[in-house]
Amino acid sequence: MKRIMFPFLFALPFLLMACSKKKEVDQGELAGRAAKLYYEQLLKGQYEAFLGGDNRSEKLPDSYRKQLLKNLRQFIEQQKKEHEGIDSVSLASSVFSEKDSTASAFLLFHYGDKTTEQVVVPMIKRKGVWMMR
């Protein structure tokens, strides 16, 4: 019995230390999830919310903001005509650059005509929030 207990008691502190370490947050994954969320808002017709995910959106003049919202609506309509719309968006991968707190999120658009397209969404972290660049 001592032969079994001694190695277990010896290893127990090391196992506890290994299990209690804080896991680092994958910033690339967080940026990718944020990009996916923004595009899901776009698909739901929440154009203001999508535009709110842009890094520079609060500094836009009203006339330019209105034009961007119009362009977003036109983009969705164009996708409906060309591909029977975008059914869903998924995160393929992401790459994080710690040097300048930026990331590239690689999203897949799954179209209604059963085709897919990969798009790259450049992201930047501002005040702890991932925003589109």
What are these regions (language model features)?
Residues 32-37, 47-98:
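Short solvent-exposed beta->alpha transition segments
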Residues 11, 35, 103-105:
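Small side chains
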Residues 1-19:
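Sec-dependent bacterial lipoprotein signal peptides
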